[in-house]
Each structure stands twice: as C-alpha cells, then as structure tokens.
C-alpha cells in the first residue's frame, strides 16, 4: 500500500528483456534505496512494482508484458522521469490516501492554468472510470495523491499546490500528455456492496411469503 506522497523523482534508464516474457525496468534514483531489500514494493508513476536489484545509483524492477501494455512505460513519447514512493510501513502516517498501485486507466491533460502560485489541471477520462471519481474526493495521478476540484461525466480538475507541482513530474506535463490514473478504492468497495444488495433484493431468500407459497 502507498499514500500518494512522492519521495523522489527518478529517471528511466532502460527496459530490457530477461527472457520468458519477463522484462526489467531500471530507474536511476538516489534516496529510495535507504533500507531497501530485494522484493520490496515501489510505486513507479503510481504502478506497484517489485525490486529485483539495486545499488546506490539505480533500482531495477520486474515488469510483466501485461504491465507494459496497460501502462505508459512502453510509450516512447512518455516522460522518462517518474515519481517514486516506497510502500507504506506499519505506523507511518497516512498523509495522502490509500493508493494500491493498480492503474485503472489513462487520462489526458487538456488544460493547465496558473492561478497565482497555484495550478489547475484538467483531464479527460473514460466515463466508465469517471463514475468512481467524486467531488472533493481523492485520486492518484502518476502516483500522486490529489483532490478533485471539479468534475463532469468524462472530465475532472485537480488543484495543485506549488510544492506538489515542483516536487513531482506534474510540472513536466504538457497538454495532450497521458497519465496513469487510480481512483479511490473505497468507491469500488461501495459499488461492489451495492451490487450484492441489489442481488439480495431480487433474491431475498426465505421470507414469510416464501414459506406461505410453499405450504408452511
């Protein structure tokens, strides 16, 4: 689990095949290696990846073909700089929100507006994903925990403070760029519970009417 608070900006140095459909993603980094162990989880632009090698200058991760297909890592036009966050430890403060590191979709940046020292960034997203986004709710953009300032059926806006804009790769984004999006997991749990509630209404099980209809 992650919190969406970025620790460091790294740079992708290579993606290479390890054989048997396994890929290795190597990121140049300086600080996240502190207390790192093989097998640790790190969110790389919001994607949970497993550490398979590291030294003082870089970290390598295992990358499945499916992850390559469903993320922007294989996009040559995508930024080579990435947000990095180590997995949350027991007892850490939850400064952002619960981020799993499972990307739901891509969103496209359509507008950036500077208002004083703050920034408003507008994105378009598939309506099937937008239904999980709520006003003033949380969303992870490239792994960054952000708050929804406005939304419609296929669009949302985030308001970004200067520190977040400067200390993450948000400042690198240009209109037309795509980003990884992970919606708040709580919305998906609510949807799942409601689905079961509807099933129970359609099939209520043993009721007084059921017993009467069966001669009891």
Locations of regions flagged by a protein language model:
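Conserved loop->alpha-helix
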Residues: 1-216
């Amino acid at each position: 689990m992650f919190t969406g608070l970025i620790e460091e900006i790294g740079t992708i140095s290579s993606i290479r095949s390890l054989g048997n459909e396994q890929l290795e993603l190597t990121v140049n980094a300086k600080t996240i290696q502190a207390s790192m162990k093989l097998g640790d989880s790190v969110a790389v632009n919001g994607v949970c990846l497993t550490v398979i090698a590291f030294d003082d200058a870089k970290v390598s991760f295992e990358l499945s073909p499916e992850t390559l297909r469903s993320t922007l890592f294989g996009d040559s036009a995508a930024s080579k700089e990435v947000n990095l966050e180590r997995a949350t430890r027991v007892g850490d403060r939850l400064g952002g929100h619960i981020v799993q590191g499972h990307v739901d979709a891509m969103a496209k940046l359509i507008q950036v507006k500077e208002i004083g020292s703050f920034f408003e960034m507008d994105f378009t997203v598939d309506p099937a994903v937008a239904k999980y986004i709520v006003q003033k709710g949380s969303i992870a953009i490239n792994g960054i925990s952000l708050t929804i300032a406005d939304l419609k059926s296929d669009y949302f806006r985030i308001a970004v403070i200067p520190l977040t804009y400067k200390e993450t790769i948000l400042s690198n984004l240009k209109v037309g760029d795509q980003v990884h999006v992970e919606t708040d997991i709580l919305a998906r749990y609510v949807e799942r519970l409601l689905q079961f509630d509807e099933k129970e209404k359609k099939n209520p099980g043993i009721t007084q009417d059921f017993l009467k209809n069966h001669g009891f």
